[in-house]
Amino acid sequence: MQNATLSPIPLLQRSLQLLNPIYTPLLILASPSFFIPIIGEIIPVLGGVLNLAYVVVGAPILGGAALLLVDQHLKQQSPVLGNSLDQAISKAVPLVLGSILLSLIVFGGSLLFVIPGIYLGVKLAFLICAIALEGQGAVEGLGYSWNLVKGRWWGVFWAFLALGLIFGIPILILSLIVGGIAAALNLGLLVAVVIGAVTTAIVPILNIFTVLLFRSLQEIQGQTA
């Protein structure tokens, strides 16, 4: 890997450099987040069931597969969608359990005020990476992420915040524009299609960015496997 850094701009530039060869398989792994909201607009009950199943089970497994695929590419191995998905499925239990634990912890922290939730979210942001890439269990992954971010909280927070602003602000503006048009034409499905397409299209970049940040932290903290 190139020089370790927590600076968001170099990480984003590197993410874009790595994107092309693995964009299509990463997009396939992210595709349920595009189709499920559309189904929800057409058949609300079915959409609700699918969304719940995806959030609880599908997203952790597919997200883990995406991280594995990116990591294979970083290691100059031939990234194969099927292999990454098989590996993620073999870790399905810790991935799903870890995702549930993370959601409960961050939600619980947010109930105490927003700041504890943000703090915990950043400290535990690499739980899925720890499970998928380092073979940690769900509980062990919490500790792994916590220790990895130790002393680097602000750097990690800024990296994710900057990335969120870079992509989030344009998406917000687009949502307002499309939402206004959809409301005028009474086309709620238009919002789901356009916003879903845009957000799904950038998920592969977020996958790569997250793995690069994770590996950079490992190198900085001397925890590289």
Where do the PLM segments sit?
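Hydrophobic alpha-helical membrane segments
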Residues: M1-A225
